[in-house]
Amino acid sequence: MLDSFDKGWFVLQTYSGYENKVKENLLQRAQTYNMLDNILRVEIPTQTVNVEKNGQTKEIEENRFPGYVLVEMVMTDEAWFVVRNTPNVTGFVGSHGNRSKPTPLLEEEIRAILLSMGQTIDVFDTNIKEGDVVQIIDGAFMGQEGRVVEIENNKVKLMLNMFGSETVAEVELYQIAEL
């Protein structure tokens, strides 16, 4: 269960097509209800896609997860109430009903989403160090275990055992998890 003052990233479910309005309303409500210390950041993951129309290709931004908005917040009762009662928010993902508080995203999940958006992210505290055995949780080597041989600037070199021989692979820090 989440302590009443844990900070984390949470996923809001919204009516599809209302993501920008929810972001706008939520930021306004955070200011109105004096919650700017609790409701820290609101993001709508987008991606650039090429659309061909009338023989012309055009780049457009589209929502990566239609009907969902990410919010970084300190989960107090008051902040939960303000967010939950924002117009066009239908609920929190990971909330198990009965007015229970939701489960935050895992650090690796939010890191991957923000990096895919080209966002700068805070450096996350990690206990991973050279010599540790870790599991790759994202990318081409997902599911493999490897030994950390070097960590530099959020890049990690791992020694993997593939096809009976050891191979060095370089992955991003967000792509691995401690075992």
UniProtKB/Swiss-Prot annotation:
The reply to whether Transcription figures as a keyword in the UniProt entry is yes
Q: Which GO terms describe its cellular component?
A: cytosol
InterPro entries in the cross-refs: KOW, NGN, NGN-like_dom, NGN_dom_sf, NusG-like, Rib_uL2_dom2, Transcrpt_antiterm_NusG, Translation_prot_SH3-like_sf
Protein keywords: Transcription, Transcription antitermination, Transcription regulation, Transcription termination
Domain KOW as annotated: residue spans = 130-157
Instruction: Kindly give the Gene3D superfamilies that the UniProt entry links to this protein.
Output: 2.30.30.30, NusG, N-terminal domain
Keyword hit for Transcription = yes
Short name of one Pfam family for this protein?
KOW
Which CDD domains does the record associate with it?
A: KOW_NusG (cd06091), NGN_Bact_1 (cd09891)
What biological-process terms (Gene Ontology) are attached? DNA-templated transcription termination; regulation of DNA-templated transcription elongation; transcription antitermination; transcription elongation-coupled chromatin remodeling
Annotated family = Belongs to the NusG family.
| Function recorded in the entry | Participates in transcription elongation, termination and antitermination.
Protein's recorded name:
Transcription termination/antitermination protein NusG
Q: What is the originating organism of this protein?
A: Streptococcus pyogenes serotype M1
Query: Species lineage, top-down?
Result: Bacteria, Bacillati, Bacillota, Bacilli, Lactobacillales
Q: Which gene encodes it?
A: nusG
